C-alpha cells in the first residue's frame, strides 16, 4: 500500500468482495485461509482473503476491487503446485481461486483446438475429448490430471 493512501477498512473491503461473487465464495476465516498459504512442497503467508469467482464478470469486478484497494493479487488453479506458483510472501494479498471457472467453452475438431476456462481440470478436458477420439498432446502438469489447465499454463508466471 502506498504511504499516501488511507488505511483499508477491511470489513468494507470484504463486504464488497462478497457483493462481487456472493458471500459463500469469499473466505476470510484465518483457519480456512491457512491451506491457501501452502502448496504441495512450499509454505508461505496465507492470503487475507480467498475469492472464488464463477464468471468472467465476477473476475473483473473482483480484480478491480483488489487493485483499487492497492492490494496484492494471486491467482490459484487447483492448488496442486509444488513450486510455489501461487504463493506470495506479502501480507496484503488476496487469492483468486479459479476452480469455479470450469466450463469447456469450445472443442473445435476441424482446427484442433479447445477453449476452456481456467478452472477446467486436465481430467475434465480429457473426458470431454475422449469420446471424440481426441486428446491433448500432453496430460497436464506433473501434479496430475486434477490440476487445472489455467494453473498449468500459469506455472512460473507469478510476478509477470
Report the location of each language-model feature.
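Alpha-helix initiation and N-capping motif
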Residues: 10-14, 122, 146
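Short, mixed-charge, low-aromatic patches
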Residues: 14-22, 80-86, 129-133
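Short low-complexity, flexible loop/linker segments enriched in glycine and/or proline
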Residues: 41-42, 88-92, 152-154
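Conserved A3 ("GATE") glycine/threonine-rich loop of ANL adenylate-forming enzymes
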Residues: 79-81, 142-155
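N-terminal glycine-rich flavin-associated loop
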Residues: 17, 41-73, 98-140, 155-160
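N-terminal accessory segments
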Residues: 1-40, 65-73, 78
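Flexible loop/turn segments at secondary-structure boundaries
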Residues: 34-35, 58, 81-84, 122-124, ...
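Structural signature of FAD isoalloxazine-binding scaffolds in flavoprotein oxidoreductases
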Residues: 52, 83-102
Amino acid at each position: 500500500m502506498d504511504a499516501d493512501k488511507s488505511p483499508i477498512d477491511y470489513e468494507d473491503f470484504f463486504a464488497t468482495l462478497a457483493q462481487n461473487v456472493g458471500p459463500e465464495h469469499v473466505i476470510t476465516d484465518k483457519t480456512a485461509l491457512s491451506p491457501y498459504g501452502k502448496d504441495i512442497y512450499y509454505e508461505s503467508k496465507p492470503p487475507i482473503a480467498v475469492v472464488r469467482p464463477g464468471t468472467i464478470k465476477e473476475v473483473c469486478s473482483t480484480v478491480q476491487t483488489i487493485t483499487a484497494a492497492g492490494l496484492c493479487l494471486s491467482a490459484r488453479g487447483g492448488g496442486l503446485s509444488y513450486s510455489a506458483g501461487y504463493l506470495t510472501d506479502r501480507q496484503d494479498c488476496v487469492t483468486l481461486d479459479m476452480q469455479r471457472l470450469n466450463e469447456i467453452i469450445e472443442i473445435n475438431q476441424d482446427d484442433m483446438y479447445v477453449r476452456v476456462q481456467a478452472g477446467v481440470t486436465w481430467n475434465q478436458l480429457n473426458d470431454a475429448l475422449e469420446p471424440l477420439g481426441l486428446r491433448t498432446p500432453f496430460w497436464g502438469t506433473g501434479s496430475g490430471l486434477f490440476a487445472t489447465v489455467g494453473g498449468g499454463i500459469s506455472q512460473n508466471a507469478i510476478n509477470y
